[in-house]
Design a protein with these regions (language model features):
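SDR active-site strand-loop-helix element
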Residues: 3-4, 40-46, 99-101
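NAD(P)H-binding glycine-rich loop region in Rossmannoid oxidoreductase-like domains
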Residues: 1-20
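Flexible, glycine-rich beta-alpha linker
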Residues: 49-50, 94-115
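Glycine-rich NAD(P)-binding loop of the Rossmann-fold in SDR/ketoreductase-type enzymes
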Residues: 16-27, 61, 65, 69-70, ...
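Conserved Rossmann-fold NAD(P)-dependent oxidoreductase catalytic core, especially the SDR/UDP-sugar
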Residues: 26-66, 86
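Substrate-positioning beta->alpha
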Residues: 109-114, 128-150, 157
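Active-site Tyr-X1-5-Lys
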Residues: 65-97
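Mid/C-terminal beta-alpha module of Rossmann-like enzyme folds, strongest
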Residues: 145-208, 237-261
C-alpha cells in the first residue's frame, strides 16, 4: 500500500509535487514487481478529475492545479507500467489498483481545520438547497476501505473511487460549524466561481485550488461508487464525527440550537 506523497492542494512549486506524487508511485511499482509483490494499492486523489459533475473510476482526468496535475501524472505512470508489466513480465506482474480518495478529513489535517473555521464563521454558506453530495470523507473510513481492498478475494479494478459517506454540502457545513449555513442563490454562486477562475487564470492559476474548494463547499460533486456498493465494500461512515470533532477543537462554544444533536 503506497500512501506516501505530498498532500498540498494549494502548493504551486511543481518539482517537489512531481517527485512525491508522480515519480515515487512508479518507483514503488517497479520495486514491487522486482520483489514479487502480488498486489499494489496506490492512494491517489479524486482531484485528478477536476470539476467534472460526477467523480468516477474512469481514466478520464481534468487536472486544474499543480497538485492535481502531479497526481494525474502518477496515475498515468502506473497505468503505463501496468501495460508494460503485463506485456513484458506477465508472470511477475503485480496487480495494480489506484484508489482515488475524495476530500479526506481528519484530526490534524490543515484542510479540515480550515473547513471547520469557515463553517463556524458568519460566512458559512451553500448553494441553493444544499442537497448536493459532498465528497468530504473521513480518514477512518478511508483506512477501513484500504484494508477491504487489500483483502478482497477477487480481482480489483485498475481504478477504484472511495465510497461516499452520505454527507451533503449542507450537512457537512452544519457538522463542521455547528451552525446553519446561509443558502445563497445558485446563479450568484456560479457567477462568483466563474469570476474566481478567471482571476486565477490571469495570475497563472495561482488560486485555482482555493476557488475549487469553495466550489465544492457550495455545490458538492457527484460520486459514482457503484463498484464498491456492488461488492458491499462500504466502510463505516464517520465523517460527521470527524467534522464535529474538528469544530470542537477550535474551542468555540457549541450553538445552543444543536446542544442535543
Amino acid at each position: 500500500m503506497n500512501a506516501a506523497g505530498l498532500a498540498a492542494p494549494n502548493m504551486q512549486d511543481l518539482p517537489p509535487l512531481m517527485g512525491a506524487n508522480a515519480l515515487l508511485p512508479a518507483v514503488i511499482a517497479i520495486a514491487a514487481q522486482r520483489t514479487g509483490v502480488r498486489r499494489v494499492i496506490h492512494l491517489s486523489s479524486a482531484a485528478v478529475q477536476g470539476p467534472r459533475p460526477v467523480l468516477d473510476a474512469s481514466e478520464e482526468t481534468a487536472p486544474f492545479s499543480a497538485y492535481s496535475f502531479s497526481k494525474t501524472l502518477g496515475e498515468e505512470a502506473l497505468l503505463d507500467l501496468q501495460d508494460y508489466f503485463l506485456e513484458e513480465h506477465p508472470e511477475s506482474a503485480p496487480e495494480l489498483c489506484i484508489l482515488r480518495a475524495t476530500s479526506v478529513q481528519g484530526r490534524g489535517r490543515r484542510t479540515t481545520e480550515l473547513f471547520a473555521k469557515m463553517a463556524s464563521s458568519p460566512f458559512a454558506s451553500v448553494a441553493g438547497a444544499g442537497q448536493g453530495k459532498s465528497p468530504v470523507s473521513s480518514v477512518y473510513a478511508l483506512s477501513e476501505f484500504v484494508v477491504m481492498l487489500g483483502t478482497f478475494p477477487g480481482e480489483l479494478p485498475t481504478i477504484v473511487l472511495q465510497p461516499w459517506e452520505g454527507a451533503t454540502v449542507a450537512s457537512a457545513s452544519l457538522d463542521a460549524g455547528r451552525r446553519k449555513p446561509h443558502h445563497l442563490p445558485e446563479w450568484l454562486c456560479r457567477a462568483a466561481i466563474k469570476a474566481g477562475y478567471k482571476v486565477s487564470e490571469l495570475m497563472n492559476d495561482r488560486f485555482s485550488g482555493s476557488v475549487r474548494k469553495v466550489e465544492v463547499m457550495w455545490f458538492g460533486q457527484g460520486i459514482d461508487d457503484s463498484w464498491a456498493r456492488k461488492n458491499n465494500l462500504l466502510p463505516t461512515p464517520r465523517v460527521r464525527e470527524v467534522l464535529r470533532t474538528a469544530h470542537t477543537a477550535l474551542g468555540k462554544k457549541k450553538d445552543r440550537r444543536f446542544a442535543n444533536s
